[in-house]
Amino acid sequence: MASLKEIDGRIKSTKKMKQITKAMNMVSSSKLRRAEKNTKQFEPYMEKMQDAITAIAGASKNSSHPMLRPRQVQRSGYLVITSDKGLAGAYSSNVLKRLINDIKEKHTSSDEYSIIVLGQSGVDFLKNRGYEIENSLVDVPDQPSFKSIQAIAKHAIDLFSEEHIDELKIYYSHYVSVLENKPTTKQVLPLSREDSSQGQGQMSSYEFEPDKESILSVILPQYVESLIYGTILDAKASEHAARMTAMKNASDNATELIDDLSLQYNRARQAEITQQITEIVGGSAALE
């Protein structure tokens, strides 16, 4: 049985750890609120951009723009969003497992795909397993600006435009609620034209200057960059929620451990006192 000193030391160290996890929970909660706000503020812009894209594409069904034209997939591009820091439960590992499973299922050679990674945990995970990384971005801010991710988003788009890849998919954790995040795969390029007919009626009376193709050549890359940025905002909200939940669970577990250790301490203390009383009584009896 552990001594009173050992048990007391464990209680003190666990209390200190609980203070840390509780503080981290509060910090993550604050970051989550900001991330939710950023995502909500970005949604109206994306909706308007989506309206413009579907309207122009709907009015130009025969568009030859490469971003709207599916082609035979010989090489896939994967943009993977993970965290830079740990202590977020299975946030990154679930996304990476999904990616690895898809690679093993769909590809027989590393020449058939390119991987772009956001987040140090993803870089470390893939490098340790021998996967080649096309490009990476680490130290992504907790509240990323568009400028902070634009370069890597443009690189992913350029790979598609220059036909180094034939499709681009994003692997990330979608924020559902504080208690739920969902590993998700999103097709980014080529863009879907399923909804393009929705804008055709509302834009049929408009004239496009200089012409629809010229407008698409400018607006489509901007739209895809924005789509990637919006996905990163979503993933960041999911990360903060996952870390907040993990720290709350750690704090709750610390509370339970402190209670158990306190019970052990009291029992050990009681046994020690009983032993001391027994020794005193025994000594008194021997003196009589």
Curated annotation (Swiss-Prot):
Please give the Gene Ontology molecular function terms for this protein: ATP binding; proton-transporting ATP synthase activity, rotational mechanism
**Is the keyword Transport in the record?**
yes
GO CC terms on record? plasma membrane; proton-transporting ATP synthase complex
How does this protein sit in the membrane? Peripheral membrane protein
Subcellular localization is given as: Cell membrane
Its BP terms in the Gene Ontology are: proton motive force-driven plasma membrane ATP synthesis
InterPro entries for the chain:
ATP_synth_F1_ATPase_gsu (IPR035968), ATP_synth_F1_gsu (IPR000131)
Q: Please list which residues make up the signal peptide.
A: none
Q: Which Pfam families does this entry report, sorted A to Z? A: ATP-synt (PF00231)
Q: What is its main location?
A: membrane
User: Which keywords does UniProt give here?
Assistant: ATP synthesis, Cell membrane, CF(1), Hydrogen ion transport, Ion transport, Membrane, Transport
Q: How would you summarize the oligomeric state and partners of this protein?
A: F-type ATPases have 2 components, CF(1) - the catalytic core - and CF(0) - the membrane proton channel. CF(1) has five subunits: alpha(3), beta(3), gamma(1), delta(1), epsilon(1). CF(0) has three main subunits: a, b and c.
- HAMAP family linked to this entry: ATP_synth_gamma_bact
Explain the purpose of this protein. Produces ATP from ADP in the presence of a proton gradient across the membrane. The gamma chain is believed to be important in regulating ATPase activity and the flow of protons through the CF(0) complex.
Family membership noted in the UniProt record: Belongs to the ATPase gamma chain family.
Q: What is this protein called?
A: ATP synthase gamma chain
- Quote the gene name from the UniProt entry: atpG
